[in-house]
Amino acid sequence: DVYKRQEVKENMPAFDEIMNLSDFFKVMGDSTRLQLLLSLQQSEMCVSDLANVLDMTKSAVSHQLKALRLSKLIKSRKEGKTVYYSLDDEHIETILGMAFDHTKEH
């Protein structure tokens, strides 16, 4: 019906917001980055620890962490010479949990 279509159209987010959401899912759509996020969901970790857990080089881990940091999915803090990474906020943890639950159900 015409009113329903108009209501849907009026409630559609702005194009910029849709593009931001699309970029978010592109970053989340990489299996290596998902492994990093799932690791960081359990514990704050440094590059060496993440490389060990995922059996990757430190360079490869650093490259993926940069993408996650630029997308504001993770944050970092420095302690001495070591940089520790963690999820940026509880929204990321919730999204990961909901997505994981959804895939287990289907």
Please place each PLM-identified region on the residue numbering.
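Short, small-residue-biased leader/transition segments that mark boundaries at the very start
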Residues: 2-3
